[in-house]
Structure formats: C-alpha cells, structure tokens
C-alpha cells in the first residue's frame, strides 16, 4: 500500500523571529488532534550536518538542498513536516516548493529590532562585533516570500495566536481536517 503523501510547511523569517517556537506550538496543536508531524529545525540539523558551520553561500546551498531532500523522503512516506529555517534566499524555499507536493510557506514577520532583542544565541551580537559576516537581516539580505500561504506577525500577536492562525491555514489548505484548536493546550506546550 502506498502511503498518503504528507504535507510540508516552511516557517521562514529572520533569525529569532519565532520560527522554532511556532513550529513546536503547531506540532503540539496537531498532536492533540492525533496528527503526527516532524519538526526539521535548521539549528538542530546544523548540529549534525555542519557542527562547525561557516555559513558560506556554498555551505548554505548544500545545507538547504539536504534539508529539502530529508523533507521529501519524509513526506513521500506519509510523514508531515514542519521546516523551521530562515532560508534567507527565496531559491531555497522555491526548491522545496518544487520538490514537495503538498507545500505551504508561512512568513514569520518580525522587525529586525525585535529579533535582535530576542536573540538568545547571540547571532546578531556576533555580527555587530565582526565575529560573523553573513547574518540575514544585517550583512546579507533576507528575501521575504512574495506570496506566502500565510504571514504571522510575532511582534504584534502572541505565539498562541500565531499557532492558531497557522493551524487554521492548514485546515483551509485541506492539509488537515477542521477541528477546534485547544488554546489552553497550546499554551502548555509552548510553556514547556
């Protein structure tokens, strides 16, 4: 029996815009509905694939090709996938759109100033002190999606509200069935 193709959702935005937080929240909301989903978080994948990343153009091209390939393997075998990755160049996300049958892109919108204030990994500080030279939003341009399936504003809306918007959009796209989202449970998941 051939498994049903899973969906792929790409959360894109500047570093520290809230992609991983929202990815975890969406996973929690979907698991409450017995919908399995795998998070492919670029930070975690980098620890395995490029433990000492250079963030060069060549390395990023390779990394996002591998990330899309992993996503394709998962979705072709029925798994649902959420990518939480800046992927600052549109071509990275376009490659995923071309390779994955049921694909949607969510733009996690947040000002550079707010992202810098949220930065727990010190990415922006490294850029400002010259320790990093290719940080999206500062030294390299971030290319926002021209027509995302959804834009969520993590500066104006809570993580819970953004998760609700994303789950609603997954329903509208018919990636998942319609069901009421339990916001209390989302808050629990995001708090852990």
Name the predicted role of every residue range.
Residues 117-165, 173-190:
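Small-molecule kinase domains that catalyze NTP-dependent phosphoryl transfer to phosphate-bearing small molecules
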Residues 19:
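Conserved lysine of the Walker
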Residues 15:
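The conserved Walker
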Residues 24-72, 76:
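Conserved substrate/cofactor phosphate-moiety recognition/catalytic segment
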Residues 1-8:
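Extreme N-terminal, non-catalytic leader segments
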Residues 11:
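Hydrophobic anchor at the beta1->P-loop junction of P-loop NTPases
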Residues 58-104, 108, 124-127:
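Glycine-rich phosphate-binding loop used to anchor ATP phosphates in small-molecule kinases
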Residues 44-46, 87-90, 109-114, 156-158:
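Conserved nucleotide-binding/hydrolysis micro-motifs of P-loop NTPases
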